[in-house]
Regions:
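Local sequence-structure signature of Cys/Sec-based thiol-disulfide redox active-site neighborhoods
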Residues: 1-34
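Hydrophobic beta-strand residues in large extracellular and virion-surface proteins
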Residues: 7-9, 28, 39, 50-52, ...
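Aromatic-residue detector
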Residues: 13-15, 29, 46, 64, ...
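Compositionally biased, charge-rich low-complexity tracts
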Residues: 23-25, 29-30, 34, 86-88, ...
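A generic structural motif
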Residues: 33-41
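Short, intrinsically disordered low-complexity segments
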Residues: 41-62
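Non-catalytic, surface beta->alpha helical segment in thiol-disulfide oxidoreductase systems
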Residues: 55-100
């Protein structure tokens, strides 16, 4: 199977973010499974909120979700990330993401 890149999640080392990470993580897993993409999670002390990026090959990471000030459900997070990936799939450098357009 051809790799469709990966999602990179940055989260705080604060234990208070674990519940949010689970919610966001489940949403990312749903999108990643549709694309055949990998997921990496990094805990950092210099991160105040949870951030999700998409990375395909090179070093460039595209921000697809920021949880700052949000308490959205898994479904809301999923639709937000999916919407960003859908839009990105029209860019010539990200045609591998076109599978997100199929239902």
């Amino acid at each position: 199977m051809l790799s469709s890149g990966k999602f990179v999640i940055y989260t705080s080392r604060s234990s208070g973010r674990r519940k949010r990470l689970k919610t966001i993580g489940r949403a990312v897993v749903r999108v990643a499974e549709r694309l055949g993409a990998d997921i990496e999670v990094y805990q950092r002390k210099d991160v105040l909120s949870i951030f999700v990026y998409y990375k395909n090959g090179g070093e460039e990471k595209i921000p697809v979700y920021c949880d700052w000030g949000k308490n959205w459900s898994e479904e809301d997070v999923y639709h937000t990330i999916r919407s960003v990936i859908y839009t990105l799939s029209f860019h010539p450098d990200y045609t591998i993401l076109q599978t997100i357009r199929k239902r």
